[in-house]
Amino acid sequence: MAVTDVFARRATLRRSLRLLADFRYEQRDPARFYRTLAADTAAMIGDLWLATHSEPPVGRTLLDVGGGPGYFATAFSDAGVGYIGVEPDPDEMHAAGPAFTGRPGMFVRASGMALPFADDSVDICLSSNVAEHVPRPWQLGTEMLRVTKPGGLVVLSYTVWLGPFGGHEMGLSHYLGGARAAARYVRKHGHPAKNNYGSSLFAVSAAEGLRWAAGTGAALAVFPRYHPRWAWWLTSVPVLREFLVSNLVLVLTP
């Protein structure tokens, strides 16, 4: 069975439209948006593990690189997965406020580019929408492979720069260029964007991710995270994928 066979059944147009509808709440109601995204991510990881191991990941240990305030911790703990979150930004760790005071799992403040974990120490290593926020995304990916046990899963998912959501809160102005979009945001709002081009947001292409994954010799699959199964072919078309694959998933096994 291919690693994506189970998840492909879940990757329907209805799912894609539901996630797209919730995207509009990311800024004004982040709890609603991230709970939906976390539940969908936990289901995706469960499907990928089931396809490769013929059983759900109950009792397995997952390291979430860039885990944020706890939405993902809750979703994975509810699925019976042991959760460890890594987050370098203390503001992000506490962004959800008192609602996550008693959040499940364990949290470590550290950089994804230098994970403070031993080699071969977790069953699953996930990074969701983080690679575009670090200056060396493939160093992050290499670290994820290092800490994952042989036969485990590494799932690195990131926002493609030239896709419609590449600019994050800068909107579509990133098509004018990252520096110009960042300056435009400052003029309009009086302060830099949280995801500020050149410091906390970087231009990461689909081609870069595909080259890195192929170069590791550990790649199992690549697919667009939010697209229905019938649109996955877009990842195989140069140039087109940069604009139409909004989020690329790289699945690897050490």
UniProtKB/Swiss-Prot annotation:
Keywords: Methyltransferase, Transferase
Residues annotated as signal peptide: none
GO function terms (MF aspect): S-adenosylmethionine-dependent methyltransferase activity
GO biological process: methylation
EC numbers: 2.1.1.-
Family from the record: Belongs to the methyltransferase superfamily.
Miscellaneous note of the record: Was identified as a high-confidence drug target.
Protein name: Uncharacterized methyltransferase Rv0224c
Origin species: Mycobacterium tuberculosis (strain ATCC 25618 / H37Rv)
